[in-house]
Amino acid sequence: MAKKPIIGITMGDPAGNGSEISVKALADSSVYERCRPIIIGDANCMEKAVKILGKENEIKIHAVQDVKEAIFEFGTIDVYDMKLVDMKKHMYGKVSKMCGEAAFQYVVKVIDLAMKNEIDATVTNAICKEAINMAGHHYSGHTEIYADYTHTNKYTMMLAHDDLRVVHVSTHVSLRQACDKVKKERVLECIRIANNACKAIGIQEPKIGVAGLNPHCGENGMFGVEEIEEIQPAINEAMEEGINIPEKKPT
């Protein structure tokens, strides 16, 4: 029988609710039936979350410095202890450089562990973009951090649920900038990424739908020309490459 995958879970911003979410999630025994979870964060913060939730009699925190030290047993939460948070200064709901630095380093560490094959997959709790930028790390979100630290030039975010997967042309930018980013090459790049990603996760014949930008997809130019000038040409080229876009137009 194959071993259960090791899942590295970042604790998220220490001033947020990631530690509590993690405790609640790992208080469910079914999680351990499917995988071997380990939190990448601060053991002291996790201990605090356990107390806040009143689960001291159910959950114990096991701090480790190496994934190999984890025991992966229900009732015990393994924490790869980064020791980055001064609990005397810790305050929930307060944006700070300290918490931004910690949250950022948790993400960097989980990526490093995955790249070294010490864990099989990563899961992230929420970070505060303001806090990580306050700490000097100028990223707009997890996607950009992952891309940078895995040396990936072409990327986008994918949201997945059951049979639906959504890929973004743009992510954390203003609405004005998002509209400006709807260009043929970027749309085509995202179509290709979506198609390849679906195949990578086992969907043999992906069906790609491409959203329009304007009301009623521009109504043949009445409400905008992006569909005509940028999106349709990207769809045409993608179909020429053999990518299956059933509607053959933005929808």
Regions found by a protein language model. Name each.
Residues 1-142, 185-209, 213-251:
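Contiguous, glycine/small-aliphatic-enriched amphipathic segments in soluble metabolic enzymes
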Residues 73, 154, 163-165:
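A generic structural signal for well-ordered coil/turn residues at beta-strand boundaries
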Residues 159-189:
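Ligand-binding beta-strand-loop-alpha-helix segment within the catalytic cores
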Residues 76-79, 157, 166:
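Conserved beta-strand scaffold positions in the cores of enzyme catalytic domains, especially
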Residues 147-160:
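FAD-binding core/adjacent interface of flavoenzyme oxidoreductases
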